[in-house]
Amino acid sequence: MLSKSILTGLFGLALCANAQTEAPVVTDNCPTDLYHSQLQIKDNTTVRGYIDAWTDSEIGMTFRVILTGIEGHQALLYHIHENQVPEDGNCYATGAHLDPYGRGEQPPCDIGNPATCQVGDLSGKHGPAFAPDGTEFIAEFRDFFLSNVPGNPAYFGDRSWVVHAPDKTRLNCGNFEKIVPGGKK
């Protein structure tokens, strides 16, 4: 009898561990803030580009992503990561994806249910970057789960974004910077 109780308890804990926490819609963003991140100029990749983020209301953020140098008809992944890129430019030092609600990477993000994805999984929520050779990828989308307010768990303004190959190799990265009228902060 005791072993059945223990097994039942362990099963319940396993279910709780696999339960996904949905990210809340951000409703207190600052409509005057603009963030920009430029990818590095690196010898080991042709991928270049930038990402901008802004909002005209308190709900969600609008992102514009432009990437060039996507070779071989690849669909590249891109995410906001926990840490900034260090001065040596090491994209692997940026840590894991921004995931303040502990969702984890498995199962993969469901583009049809973005509240259940990692907050920083931009390509999972909005689609991967693809462009034929010699052309650029351009995407603009609204993300309701990221924040431009310091102190919010989903705040991205002091973090980085990383572009990955399909096998998750980190190709390039850059830090977000807040842009103020007349120049960078």
Residue positions per predicted region:
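Fungal secretory targeting signals
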Residues: 1-21, 185
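N-terminal leader/targeting pre-sequences
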Residues: 17-185
